[in-house]
Structures are given as structure tokens and as C-alpha cells.
Amino acid sequence: MTETTKTHVILLACGSFNPITKGHIQMFERARDYLHKTGRFIVIGGIVSPVHDSYGKQGLVSSRHRLIMCQLAVQNSDWIRVDPWECYQDTWQTTCSVLEHHRDLMKRVTGCILSNVNTPSMTPVIGQPRNETSQPIYQNNNAPSKPTAAKILGKVGESLSRICCVRPPVERFTFVDENANLGTVMRYEEIELRILLLCGSDLLESFCIPGLWNEADMEVIVGDFGIVVVPRDAADTDRIMNHSSILRKYKNNIMVVKDDINHPMSVVSSTKSRLALQHGDGHVVDYLSQPVIDYILKSQLYINASG
């Protein structure tokens, strides 16, 4: 399978991130590594989407603080970014609506429809036109033949002037080499792109709680988009999925990260990081990156038990 025939993926994580922990970032890294190892996917970007203030969770600090902490946590990443759209809405948004927003945003920016799990495009990839020197579409010093997340997401996020997109009758993106001489011949490459929800096994297990999730939303989340699950505390994801008819129905759309890394809940837990802050526990450095800790102390967050 070539680079262009692999499915290109953007991982989207929704949550309180109150505060964002090292474990949250590790989930992105582990998910990307696992998807790459399958040989079927190329992860080109990750999106952290903090929940709206009206979510109403006890101890939830304002989105202004949570957005800044998330930005500090990913400031050295070349492929994970923080998106404020969910926080900037008038009220709380469902996970389903956040996924749909990002799908529709990509569609508006590129003029194409994103592929989803159930209807992948089967059209052959468009290659280089004849009589044209073979040259990688995406270039950087380290990997001249591979797209970089920063460049592709930058293209999507900046403006249409940085992306030229044809409108094929299939669910594909077409990125055009911005350095090509468009006056003579256009070099282009077609890739399939999906947005997948990244979550821990605790969120997957919450799908099994009657009445907690809207069933129509679950159908869209799992059936149309798909989920990448990072197990926590050796969770039995097969047992979890067997407890939900919707999860069983779309089991093939749920990718469980399988690796040899121990990923205890405490590493990800925002609750334990807040407790460590309140108690002056030096082990807070195990949970939070130093820039996040510095911001929390400067802003006097989580000092009181009330948050």
C-alpha cells in the first residue's frame, strides 16, 4: 500500500481537559503510532477540543484557562493543535456535533466531502501527469516523500489560497503542490481523509450506560466517523463492546490501540493532578507538563478544593 492509498486521519479528542495532562498527549502519540503500524493509515493531525463552560462539571475552570493550558501542553508538537470552536459556542455541544463541525469545516475549506467509515472511496488514486518530473507533493528536510501534519493542517486552516481542490465525484481531498507552475501543468495528488474520535476506554464504557448518550448520536459517532480507543488500566474493551448493541453493530469501526505500554488511569487523570496541586504534592510533575504547572500556579487555579 502506497502513501497515497492509505487513509489519512485526523484524531479528535473531546473532553474537559481540566487540566490537560501528559497522559492526554500520550494518548495521541500512542494512537498515531498504532495506526501507522497497521499499515492502513497516516495520521496527519490531532485536534484537542475542550468542552464548553456550560458543561457544568464541578470544579471546571473557565474555558479561557483550559484553552491556554491545552495550548501550552501541545506547543512543542508539530501535529497536535487546540481548537476553540467548542468553547466559543453559546452553549454546550455534543461530541457528535463537534465531530460534524470539523467534518463540515474541512468540506467548506476544500470543497470536498470527507470519507467516513461506511462509505470509503474506491476510486483509484490520481497520480502525476505524464511528461512531468517526479517530485514529492509535500517536502521537508527530514522526509521528502511524506506529508507533514503541520503543513497539511496549515493548508486546511489558513485559507483557500493555500489549497487548490478539485471536486471529484467521490469522497476525497485533492491537495495541489503550491510550488507547481500552474500556468503549464498542474501536479496533484488525491488522498482519502477521515476524522476519528480519540478516547479512553472509560468513554467507550460510558456508551453502555442506559440513557447517558443519545442513541442517534452514537450511531453517527461510531457508525459514520469511527473511534480509536486507548485502553486504560488493562480495560477489557471486548467485554465493554459486547454490552452495547450499537458498539457490537459497528465493532469494525472501533480501533483499539494494542501495544506493550502500561497506561494507568492515574497518568491521564485530571482529577488526580488537581488533588496533587491542592496538596502540594511534588508528584504533580508526573501528571502535568512544566508549562502547564507554571500557568496553574501563576493563575492560582485548583488551589481550593472547589476548583
UniProtKB/Swiss-Prot annotation:
Predominant place of localization: Golgi
Uppermost EC category: transferase
Pfam family name, one: CTP_transf_like
Disulphide bridges: none
Lipidation (S-palmitoyl cysteine): C164, C165
Compartmental location: Golgi apparatus membrane; Cytoplasmic vesicle membrane; Cytoplasm; Cell projection, Axon
PTM text: Degraded in response to injured neurite. Degradation is caused by polyubiquitination by MYCBP2 after recognition by FBXO45.
Membrane-spanning segments: none
Membrane topology: Lipid-anchor
Reactions this protein catalyses: beta-nicotinamide D-ribonucleotide + ATP + H(+) = diphosphate + NAD(+); nicotinate beta-D-ribonucleotide + ATP + H(+) = deamido-NAD(+) + diphosphate
EC number(s) recorded for this UniProt protein: 2.7.7.1, 2.7.7.18
MF term (GO), any: nicotinamide-nucleotide adenylyltransferase activity
Activity regulation text: Inhibited by P1-(adenosine-5')-P3-(nicotinamide-riboside-5')-triphosphate (Np3AD) and P1-(adenosine-5')-P4-(nicotinamide-riboside-5')-tetraphosphate (Np4AD).
Chain's role: Nicotinamide/nicotinate-nucleotide adenylyltransferase that acts as an axon maintenance factor. Axon survival factor required for the maintenance of healthy axons: acts by delaying Wallerian axon degeneration, an evolutionarily conserved process that drives the loss of damaged axons. Catalyzes the formation of NAD(+) from nicotinamide mononucleotide (NMN) and ATP. Can also use the deamidated form; nicotinic acid mononucleotide (NaMN) as substrate but with a lower efficiency. Cannot use triazofurin monophosphate (TrMP) as substrate. Also catalyzes the reverse reaction, i.e.
Quaternary context: Monomer.
PANTHER family, per database record: NICOTINAMIDE MONONUCLEOTIDE ADENYLYLTRANSFERASE (PTHR12039), NICOTINAMIDE_NICOTINIC ACID MONONUCLEOTIDE ADENYLYLTRANSFERASE 2 (PTHR12039:SF18)
Protein name: Nicotinamide/nicotinic acid mononucleotide adenylyltransferase 2
Species per Swiss-Prot/TrEMBL record: Bos taurus (Bovine)
